[in-house]
């Protein structure tokens, strides 16, 4: 048994995958976005977004609500037209409707708002999509995600709707899955199942483009992350690098108040202390933190992921300029 | 690729069945009334000012053909059914866009042109259901009260109404690709179809202004001329059909170019 820790990111192990599909080497771009811009009057929903998503990776598209994630996704699917710039999906230019329509048989899409025909049962809805793009993996998926297929969709809970959405997005075994907030509405157990499923898909050579506003989720499954804020890509990097810079949110409850100068180290930033409880963001090594803490009389410790907003604040400043290193 | 057509056809079944039942009940009502009031129809025709009849295109009320043309076809078919088609047409695209169903539909390898055309093609359900069901009901009901009804004229009043109903659906469809909110699209479509019908009727009252009604689709479908005079205006039906095709083409062009 290997030690199971919070930081044991499964993404780290996939370099030496023994999966059967050797052609799925990472690198060739499945999605290539180049200066993609969408304006609605004065509002710029996407502003010169540029990055690539390589074959066989799980790419996390991270940003607060309203940052422009869904706009990018809808541009990629050709639902809306770019004001400037362009993108290719599986080699098809998003401005070329005909080419884009053709590659859609190899694309799975899970929208943030799932607009099903509510009068249909789950099974009828899947039959409908199957007629357009096949369903060779339907049964396999229905063993993992089990929406009540014989009930009308109008009676579904949001979790069941999401599961039906997941099944329709993957049942035709697409090369590329574009998922907009794929786990919202799912209970934690199903979220774990979804994450494990996405990792297995990635290991089988599929490409996953995955938007989320939850850092921990992106952190768990994604190999690489792009962060979007106010329509602009503000960071593009490997998840490990991001987390290294993101640090950890720590809350320590001490038996008695200690001298702050003795307790605080240079790796702690944004320290707030109220009576015996100290909160801070820790940017150093986890081991060093624990070694430091045992010197004090600790009642309780919580170490969690930092909030996305904190990452922005600490590492990207409040400036709206894209960072160097954006593709 | 007929998945959209199949789904849309299925969605049209319920409304078509309800309308068929409504028309069957209306027919039963009017046919049961006819023998009792046939004799009084002459008096009825004298009692009302002539423009009332001109407005609805009514004549020969004492004949079964004239009576049915006036009671069933002049109002319920030419106006209410036309409004129904406009309403359905207006919901075809706007409803799906508003509820984000279109996002999922278009994530399939299906073009926007194909989606519009399949949705329009699904109108075959109400077109066939009503234009087969209602004439059978009317014909049988006429026999049941001991009248005979010219089957050719009856078939024509339905056949020639199809382009008319399709134009009304086409008006709705153009609004449907243009307007984002399905309620606005539907409301506008049914008001527009009603106004066009009214313009046709009112402009007929004064020969100097009759040309205004040339823009109204109902000008090209005259149920009384078909049933009473057995005049079958195939040319007018052709104009309606052409107008319908233009409306569909305009809708496709708008829909393929817009953001959804």
Tell where the protein language model's regions lie, with residue ranges.
Chain A
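ABC transporter nucleotide-binding domain
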Residues: 195-280
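ABC-family P-loop ATPase nucleotide-binding domain
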Residues: 1-37, 318-327
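Short, surface-exposed acidic/glycine-rich loop or hinge patches that mediate macromolecular interfaces
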Residues: 94-97, 147, 233, 257, ...
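Short acidic active-site motifs
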Residues: 99, 238, 288-289
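ABC transporter nucleotide-binding domains
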Residues: 28-229, 235
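Short, charged/small-residue-rich alpha-helical element at the C-terminal edge
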Residues: 248-319
């Amino acid at each position: 048994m290997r030690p199971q820790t919070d930081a044991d990111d499964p993404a780290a192990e996939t370099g030496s995958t023994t999966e059967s599909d050797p052609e799925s080497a990472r690198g060739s771009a499945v999605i290539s976005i180049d200066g993609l811009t969408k304006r609605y009057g004065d509002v710029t929903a996407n502003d010169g977004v540029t990055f690539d998503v390589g074959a066989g990776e799980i790419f996390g598209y991270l940003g607060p609500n309203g940052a422009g994630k869904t706009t990018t996704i809808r541009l990629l699917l050709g639902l809306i037209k770019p004001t400037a710039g362009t993108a290719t999906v599986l080699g098809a230019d998003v401005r070329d409707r005909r080419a884009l329509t053709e590659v859609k048989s190899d694309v799975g899409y899970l929208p943030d708002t799932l607009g099903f025909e509510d009068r249909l049962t789950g099974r009828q809805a899947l039959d409908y999509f199957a007629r357009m793009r096949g369903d060779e993996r339907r049964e396999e998926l229905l063993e993992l995600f089990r929406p009540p297929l014989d009930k009308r969709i109008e009676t579904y809970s949001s979790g069941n709707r999401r599961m039906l959405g997941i099944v329709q997005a993957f049942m035709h075994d697409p090369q590329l899955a574009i998922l907009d907030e794929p786990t919202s509405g799912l209970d934690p157990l199903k979220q774990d199942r979804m994450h494990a499923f996405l990792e297995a898909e990635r290991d089988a050579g599929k490409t996953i483009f995955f938007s989320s506003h939850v850092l921990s989720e992106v952190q768990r499954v994604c190999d690489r992350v792009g962060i979007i804020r106010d329509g602009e890509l503000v960071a593009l990097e490997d998840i490990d690098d991001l987390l290294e810079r993101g640090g950890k949110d720590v809350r320590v409850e001490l038996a008695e108040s200690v001298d702050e100068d003795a307790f605080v180290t240079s790796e702690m930033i944004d320290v707030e202390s109220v009576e015996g409880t100290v909160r801070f963001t820790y940017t150093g090594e986890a081991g060093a933190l624990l070694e430091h803490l045992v010197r004090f009389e600790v009642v309780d410790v919580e170490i969690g992921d930092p909030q996305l907003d904190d990452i922005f604040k600490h590492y990207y400043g409040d400036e709206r300029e894209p960072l160097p290193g954006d593709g | 690729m007929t998945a959209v057509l199949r789904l849309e056809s299925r969605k049209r079944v319920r409304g078509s069945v309800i309308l068929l039942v409504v028309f069957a009940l209306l027919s039963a009502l009017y046919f049961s009334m006819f023998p009792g009031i046939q004799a009084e129809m002459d008096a009825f025709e004298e009692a009302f000012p002539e423009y009332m009849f001109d407005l609805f295109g009514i004549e020969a009320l004492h004949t079964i053909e004239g009576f049915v043309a006036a009671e069933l076809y002049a109002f319920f078919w030419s106006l209410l059914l036309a409004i129904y088609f406009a309403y359905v047409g207006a919901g075809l695209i706007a409803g799906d866009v508003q509820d984000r169903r279109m996002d999922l539909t278009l994530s399939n390898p299906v073009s926007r042109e194909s989606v519009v055309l399949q949705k329009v093609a699904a109108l075959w359900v109400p077109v066939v259901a009503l234009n087969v069901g209602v004439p059978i009901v009317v014909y049988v009901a006429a026999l049941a009260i001991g009248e005979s009804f010219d089957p050719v004229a009856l078939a024509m009043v339905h056949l020639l109404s199809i382009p008319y109903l399709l134009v009304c659906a086409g008006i709705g469809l153009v609004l449907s690709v243009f307007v984002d909110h399905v309620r606005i699209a539907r409301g506008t479509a049914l008001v527009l179809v009603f106004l066009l019908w009214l313009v046709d009727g009112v402009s007929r009252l004064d020969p100097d202004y009759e040309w205004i009604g040339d823009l109204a689709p109902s000008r090209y479908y005259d149920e009384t001329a078909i049933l009473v005079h057995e005049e079958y205006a195939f040319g007018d039906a052709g104009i309606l059909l052409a107008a319908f095709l233009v409306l569909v083409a305009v809708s496709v062009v708008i829909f393929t170019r817009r953001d959804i």
